[in-house]
Amino acid sequence: MARIAGVDLPRGKRVDIALTYIYGIGRTTALQILDVTGVDWSRNIDDLSADEVNEIRKELEQNHKVEGDLRREISSNIKRLMDIGCYRGLRHRRGLPVHGQRTHTNARTRKGPRRGAVGKKK
């Protein structure tokens, strides 16, 4: 089992699919990495030699932010928005949609479960 960027890649999967198990790597980026390293995308992860795995690992470390570094950067960007008090930061702080979606109806995922209306006592 190959271990790249702290993630155990699944055995028996194609290399391009297995790379998508790494946070921050999608199909397009996986194919770009394989093109740069010269590894055939249709091969199984089990069939890769140690040199090929090391080359993929080296390419990821040099040219891509993945896993913890990427998560840290995203959270620091959101924290920066909240600290400077811009509109997007306020929306993050209040737990509302950030990109201009309507909130009168919908936005339940972002807002959480509905609060029940207070009923009239009999």
UniProtKB/Swiss-Prot annotation:
Q: Which GO terms describe its molecular function?
A: rRNA binding; structural constituent of ribosome; tRNA binding
Q: Return the annotated region ranges for Disordered.
A: 95-122
Gene3D superfamilies in the cross-refs: 1.10.8.50, 30s ribosomal protein s13, domain 2
Pfam families linked: Ribosomal_S13
GO CC, sorted alphabetically, is:
cytosol; small ribosomal subunit
Q: What does this protein do?
A: Located at the top of the head of the 30S subunit, it contacts several helices of the 16S rRNA. In the 70S ribosome it contacts the 23S rRNA (bridge B1a) and protein L5 of the 50S subunit (bridge B1b), connecting the 2 subunits; these bridges are implicated in subunit movement. Contacts the tRNAs in the A and P-sites.
Complex and partners: Part of the 30S ribosomal subunit. Forms a loose heterodimer with protein S19. Forms two bridges to the 50S subunit in the 70S ribosome.
What the entry lists under PANTHER family is as follows:
30S RIBOSOMAL PROTEIN S13/40S RIBOSOMAL PROTEIN S18 (PTHR10871), SMALL RIBOSOMAL SUBUNIT PROTEIN US13M (PTHR10871:SF1)
| Full protein name | Small ribosomal subunit protein uS13
- Natural source organism: Nitratidesulfovibrio vulgaris (strain DSM 19637 / Miyazaki F) (Desulfovibrio vulgaris)
Q: Which gene encodes it?
A: rpsM
